[in-house]
Amino acid sequence: MGTTVTPPKQPSGPAQTAANVLSVADVQSIVTASAASVNVPLAIAVSDRSGNILAVYLKANAPATAQANFGVQAPAAEVAAELARSAAFFSNDQAPISTRTVRFISASHFPPGITNTESGPLYGIENTNRGCGFNVTYLPGQSLPVPMALSGGPSLGILTGKPDAMDSNNLAVNPGGVPIFKGGEVAGGIGVAGGDEATDEYAAVAGTLANGFVPNVPSPGVVVVGGVSLPFVNQTTIPAGEQPGTANGSYTLGPLASPGPAPEGDLIAETGSTQGGLTQSEVHAIVQNTIATANLTRAVLRLPEGSRARFVIAVADLDGHLLALYRMPDATMFSVDVAVAKSRNVIYFSQAPDELSPLPQGTAVTNRTIGFGAQPFFPSGIDATLPGPFFSLFQYDLANPCTQGHQAANPNQNGVVFFPGAAPLYHGSQLVGGIGVSGDGVDQDDFVAAAGANGFAAPQAIRADNYSVRGVPMPYQKFPRDPEN
């Protein structure tokens, strides 16, 4: 008869310290080591943890363009910058995450390339963090940069190398984004573009290895999701046939020092609704309940096993205006954009006509509902089926960043998120707002969001899980089996 072992409730990381932000000298040494690691013309960029681009460096004869997502050729400098941001945004102090890792958990199958398995938990991640802005007034010292393109306007977003909207090749990857650690804390990311997969990844790794900007990965040394070990980097030695090079290029941006640590805690002042919905005290209670549950929830994406989860929490009013935005210490930075969008999505799509047909208007939906119906196969995990009923929404969002379906354009839009971690908020049967949570596994995100929505949950009779589409039951939320242990 087996025994149940309860892992210790390890605290998760603190806020980034000022001593561990990147200096100009740090940036220069990382870029120089990367550029000299291989005799291939490349574009190299460095980001700090918040997404400020600190350097863009083009080696002599660097290609003008490089492969981005969905078969798009984009300026190589832009690709390098977004690879750097992607690695910085996804890593936490307890677990390094590269763009290879992100691709692995966002393919149309998990693990990638295994037929008749459901999609990765972060399916659709490429549609996030495209530089939309949040239409907020930050508290003093708590502002975040808008991750716009170097040229201005929407950026390429999270880069994974996904080849097309149907994800016809799960093994296609852009692995040139690697996190930078300093003093055991995430300090930023390096992105390399312009070579082949092995060269880009090696040059990015070399920029961190040569200077000791590497993580101290706790036991067991690898993050495991659903029994599957997630890859970090593959190419840690110079690729066959390549030779070391020289730093023979020039900076087109920087080198700059990071302006400071990534902010945590309340990023904006908590306020009550201007739409006749949530009061300020209710907003505060929602945030505090979410934090309290997070502090009890076992993390999936942190090491060692038994660490507690960390999240970004957003609460939105009926018009999408943010009433609260809170980042727990060491919560992943990509989660800010994601939590904000989730909080807005559940409001709009729980009342929008026709956007989620054939669900009836007024059905309470979550981002789990939206993502489940937006897969290239429906239901996810059954190959050779038709795309989901909301797949056209995914395609529209992909082509139209900083929108919210076909809602009339307004400042409170930053895209649609196609993976879980949200709940619409109700006073009785009246929709009054939305909560979005991001920062760990999607089931953990759902669990913590539901805790925040306690007392404001959607009436059971109007939830999406009352309905089936094409004979397939639609989901609402899903929780871990034993979330605290």
Provide a role label for each language-model segment.
Residues 8-485:
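Flexible, solvent-exposed loop/hinge segments and secondary-structure transition points
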Residues 1-5:
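N-terminal Sec signal peptide cleavage junction
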